[in-house]
Amino acid sequence: MNKLKEEAKNKLIVALDYNNMEDAVKLTEKLGDKISIYKVGLESFLSTDGKLVDYLHEKGKKVFLDLKFHDITNTVKMACANAIRKKVFMFNIHCSNGSKTMKEVSDLVKESGSESLLIGVTVLTNLGEEDLQEMFRSSMKLEEIVLNLANLAKKSGMNGVVCSPQESKKIKELAGKNFVTVCPGVRPKFTLNADNKSNDDQTRIMTPSDAIKQGVDFLVVGRPITKAEDPVKAAEVILEEISEAL
C-alpha cells in the first residue's frame, strides 16, 4: 500500500450504526484490511452491550466511541472514566456541557495516562440555522456557535471537535492545525441527488475530496458504505477520492 492510500485509510472512520452484533461483524469481515477505524455509536453500543467494542479491538481495529456524553459534571466524568478503561481510540462529550466539565474530563484523561483522543461535539450535523433559531431564539449564526464551542473546547484542553466539514477550516484557523476535526456529514458524489444534496437526514454535507481540502482530519461515513449494494466497492471509491485530495 502506497503512502497516500495508507494516509487515506487512517482518515476514514466507518460508522457501524447497526442494532445487532451480527450485521456489524459481517460488514467488518467484508471490509477486512481496507478499514482500520470504526465508529460505535449509541445504537450499536447498546444493542451489543458494548461487546462490539471488544470485538473490534480483538480484530486490531481502532474505535471511535461516539456516545456524546451530556449530563452533570460528575456523571460525565464517571462515564468518561469507563470509556478510558475501554482503551478506545477516541470518544466524545458535548461541548455544551460547559468549560468546567470539559476541563475536568480533559484533566481526567491526562491523569490516567490514556492515549484516547477527547473530542467535543459542537452542533449536530443534522441541524441547520432554522433549527437553532427554533430551539434557542439566539441571534448568533450557526457557524458562530460552532466556532465559539470549538474555542471553548480548545481552551479546556480537549483534543478536537466533531463538526461539519464546512466548519473545519475556520476551526483550524482559530484553534491551530493540530486541533483535530472529526466530521460526519460526508457524502461521496455517488450518493448525491441532482441538486448535490443528500437524500438522508444530514443537512451540512460535503464530499470526501472537498472535506480533505478543508483540512478535515477524520471523515465519518456510515450509510454510503453500510447501505451500499457493494460496501467494499463503496469504501474503495471513497478511499480513492480521499487519497486523490491529499
Regions of interest found by a model, annotated:
Residues 36-39, 64, 89-92, 119, ...:
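Conserved beta-strand positions in the central sheet of alpha/beta enzyme cores
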Residues 16-34, 39-57, 73-75, 151, ...:
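Conserved alpha/beta-domain cores
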Residues 27, 74-83, 169-171, 191-217, ...:
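Catalytic cores of alpha/beta
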Residues 33, 59, 86, 156, ...:
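Structural motif
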Residues 1-25, 168-169, 173-176, 198, ...:
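N-terminal amphipathic alpha-helix/helix-capping segment at the start of soluble metabolic enzymes
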